[in-house]
């Protein structure tokens, strides 16, 4: 899926994106909310292998010609999918780009791909993301207390969200 709006482009990730993904995925500051405060410890070669067959589900966010983050979606069934986003370059965080990028991506999932429900989860400590999701119309379904351990063995809690087209509030 490729989506464009103003200076934002969301496009399928390709093997040549592996070096930037590797930098992001090995950065503990970027990956901490996903449970990897020390980063993933992966290689460019490993990421290239992952991207070759599955790149239609992983996407790169480009802003004014610069890769700034990634998004993905995974079909859950014929009518619903799970999705995720990371604005990985810190200088582009807290500028409203996440909300606009999510609006663009979600409109594609609903309007272009025909999904009728989008699900996601986030770390309970990631209140900034929760605020954005709720502004977009996501409904908090549940909090899963101490439901998983991060790579340091610390218990983490997650918040599950769902969004339907009826509740979606676009910011583009």
Model regions and ranges:
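Terminal substrate-recognition subdomain of acyl/acetyltransferases
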Residues: 153-172
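Conserved GNAT acetyl-CoA-binding A-motif
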Residues: 111-121
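Conserved acetyl-CoA pyrophosphate-binding loop and the N-cap/start of the following alpha-helix
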Residues: 92, 96-105
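Conserved catalytic-core motifs of GNAT/GCN5-like acyltransferases
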Residues: 119-121, 139-156
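Active-site acidic-Proline motif in GNAT/NAT acetyltransferases
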Residues: 89-91, 95, 124-125
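Acetyl-CoA-dependent GNAT
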Residues: 37-92, 164-167
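Conserved active-site alpha-helix within GNAT-family acetyltransferase domains
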Residues: 99-100, 124-142
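A short, well-structured alpha-helix characteristic of acyl/acetyltransferase catalytic modules
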Residues: 1-44, 48, 166-172
């Amino acid at each position: 899926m490729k989506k464009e709006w103003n200076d934002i482009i969301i496009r399928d990730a390709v093997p040549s994106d592996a070096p930037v993904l590797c930098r992001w995925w090995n950065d503990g500051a970027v990956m901490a909310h996903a449970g990897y405060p020390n980063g993933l410890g992966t290689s460019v070669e490993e990421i290239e292998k992952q991207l070759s067959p599955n790149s239609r589900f992983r996407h790169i966010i480009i802003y004014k010609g610069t890769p700034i983050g990634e998004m993905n979606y995974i079909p859950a069934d014929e009518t619903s999918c799970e999705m995720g986003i990371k604005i990985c370059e810190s200088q582009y965080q807290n500028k409203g780009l996440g909300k606009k990028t999510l609006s663009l991506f979600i409109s594609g999932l609903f309007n272009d791909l025909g999904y009728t429900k989008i699900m996601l989860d986030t770390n309970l400590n990631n209140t900034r993301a929760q605020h954005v999701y709720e502004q977009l119309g996501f409904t908090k379904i549940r909090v899963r207390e101490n439901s998983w351990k991060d790579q340091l063995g610390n218990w983490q809690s997650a918040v599950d969200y769902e969004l339907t087209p009826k509740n979606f509030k676009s910011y583009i």
